[in-house]
Amino acid sequence: MVGAIRQGLGRDTATTFLIIDAQSEKNTDTAENKGFDGGKLISGIKRHIGVDTNGLPHMIHVTTANVTDRAGALEAFALCKDNLTNVQKVLADGGYTGEPFAAATYETLGAAVEIAKRSELHKFAVIPKRWVVERSFAWLEKCRRLWKNCERKLNSSLQMAVLAFLALLSKR
């Protein structure tokens, strides 16, 4: 479905530029899989997504919140490798810094990693191209079921995110 929308926009079906990010989400009491994200002080899950420059999803992965952004992204790359064959560059935020992540990304996808850093600390500024992935997370948040993790299993949480994106894409 993503490929068809990209063709309608006059683009190739597979993206060459991927923007990645992770979002921590709180669990409800029914969830079995729990982890604690020490950076955001959230007990729950993390959604790792990779989108193109239009905000269309090419990679979705769900882990417990204690998994680092780098480790979750590498897991997602390995799982979604067939969808990411044409990717040449990956844009990420400061949570993905480090040579081991860049080397593992190159080994898995054959893509270079570019880190989008803020120019000044403690000042809000929209980082060009990074807002696209944040907008995609905002689209997911419009789905009421995804505002908290209500699912018992991680795979169920993943499928709910996929269904939410399918509902969004079917409206395009």
Predicted features, each with a name:
Residues 1-172:
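Short alpha-helical elements
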